[in-house]
Amino acid sequence: MALREIIIIPDKQLRLISKPVETVSAEVRRLADDMFETMYEAPGIGLAAIQVAQPVRLITMDLVRKEGNSLTEPRAFINPEVISASEEMNVYEEGCLSIPEYYAEVERPKQVRIRYTDLDGNVKEEDADGLFATCIQHEIDHLNGVLFVDHISKLKRAMVMRKFEKAAKRGIKYV
């Protein structure tokens, strides 16, 4: 396992649409292991492969230590997709390892049904609610080039982007 560098806004790679994983290979499993190690070191509860500059549809997540979640163990999700969502919404304060030290309330569907492939190559469907639903939607957004700040007001988003663009120009790195 190896730590990987987490890319930070305004890095344009974060806006890429990640490509599907064709086969669950040793390379994909190694990437997942690296992502878990990187996520724990950061520390965070979820990480999309694009955040470590790998534009493939892979997410790692561990909500075990968080209250209000239905995910009971660390998990990797390959080619995840939301196949249905509740009309009822939930608001959670979200943060992101690619947008350090910034948090905002985001409204998302309270429950979602997801389809994904696990690290053994099995295609699964599962219901997610609470923090699990919020986190999986946040990470799937990353795979589609969408950041959580895209769900907040234009004014707040512009302020956040400006702050990170100025920091990048001055060579300030957030870690």
From Swiss-Prot:
Full protein name: Peptide deformylase
Highest taxon of source: Bacteria
Residue sites binding Fe cation per the record: 96, 138, 142
Classification lineage: Bacteria, Pseudomonadati, Pseudomonadota, Alphaproteobacteria, Hyphomicrobiales
Alphabetical keyword list: Hydrolase, Iron, Metal-binding, Protein biosynthesis
Signal peptide: none
Gene3D superfamilies in the cross-refs: Peptide deformylase
UniProt xrefs under PANTHER family: PEPTIDE DEFORMYLASE
E.C. number: 3.5.1.88
SS bond partners: none
Function: Removes the formyl group from the N-terminal Met of newly synthesized proteins. Requires at least a dipeptide for an efficient rate of reaction. N-terminal L-methionine is a prerequisite for activity but the enzyme has broad specificity at other positions.
A biological process term (GO) from this entry: translation
Organism: Rhodopseudomonas palustris (strain BisB18)
Catalytic activity: N-terminal N-formyl-L-methionyl-[peptide] + H2O = N-terminal L-methionyl-[peptide] + formate
Free-text remark on how the cofactor is bound: Binds 1 Fe(2+) ion.
InterPro entries: Peptide_deformylase, Peptide_deformylase_sf
HAMAP family: Pep_deformylase (MF_00163)
Cofactor requirement: Fe(2+)
Residues annotated as the enzyme's active site: 139
Leading EC class: hydrolase
Family named by the database record: Belongs to the polypeptide deformylase family.
Segments forming a coiled coil: none
GO MF term (any one): metal ion binding
